[in-house]
């Protein structure tokens, strides 16, 4: 499609709306209508648009939001209130232009899937170790030179993808990931494990 905006107040008027998919369109910004448009929504898919920012407070009323897919957009940063998205279970921010992941990511205690592939990340904050329910962490194709030791606290982690980065070594703490099923480490600068 080539939709670039929705009629003012459309989403807010749909009181029973639970899931929104507006992928593969021409949105350059979030739909206008403020936080009330997402009050009862549990899943939002805005994949493959041209959105360059997530407005501060846009999910302040989205108490049921558990899945956000904003892959393949133009995001350069996350909003300062990202730490308030406490019910988020799946967060896909792949293929954007993110260069930094805020420390507040640690507040997303229910997060199980975090996709950050194809961004510009040079480091992952140590607070990542607080995401104790995380099962999937996809960091493929970034600019990471190292992973924090705190990654070893992710005892539920089953899938770790760090392929196509600039890693020279892996933290020994990876040995603590007893539930790890899949580890992808190709195309790095590793000399040993």
Show where each model-derived region lies.
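Ankyrin-repeat and related helical/solenoid repeat scaffolds used for protein-protein interactions
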Residues: 156, 163-193
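Conserved hydrophobic beta-strand positions in leucine-rich repeat
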Residues: 17-22, 41-46, 65-70, 91-93, ...
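The feature encodes a structural signal of leucine-rich repeats
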Residues: 6-9, 30-33, 54-57, 78-80, ...
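Compact recognition or signaling/catalytic modules
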Residues: 93, 97, 103, 113-120, ...
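A generic tandem-repeat structural signature
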Residues: 2-53, 58-63, 67-69, 76-77, ...
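Leucine-rich repeat
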Residues: 12-17, 36-41, 60-65, 83-88, ...
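Consensus "Asn ladder" position of solenoid repeat domains
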Residues: 1, 25, 49, 70-73, ...
């Amino acid at each position: 499609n080539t939709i670039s905006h929705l009629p003012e107040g459309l989403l807010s008027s749909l009181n029973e709306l639970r899931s929104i998919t507006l992928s593969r369109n021409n949105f350059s910004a979030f739909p206008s209508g403020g936080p009330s448009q997402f009050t009862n929504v549990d899943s939002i898919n805005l994949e493959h648009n041209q959105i360059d920012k997530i407005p501060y407070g846009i999910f302040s009323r989205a108490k049921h939001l558990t899945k956000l897919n904003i892959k393949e957009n133009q995001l350069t940063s996350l909003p300062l209130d990202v730490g308030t998205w406490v019910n988020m279970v799946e967060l896909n921010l792949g293929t954007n232009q993110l260069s930094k992941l805020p420390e507040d990511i640690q507040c997303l205690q229910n997060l199980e899937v975090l996709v950050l592939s194809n961004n510009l990340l040079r480091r992952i904050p140590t607070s990542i170790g607080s995401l104790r329910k995380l099962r999937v962490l996809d960091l493929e194709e970034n600019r990471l030179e190292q992973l924090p030791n705190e990654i070893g606290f992710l005892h539920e982690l089953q899938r770790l993808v760090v392929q196509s980065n600039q890693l020279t070594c892996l933290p020994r703490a990876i040995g603590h990931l007893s539930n790890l099923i899949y580890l992808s480490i190709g195309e790095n600068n590793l000399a040993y494990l």
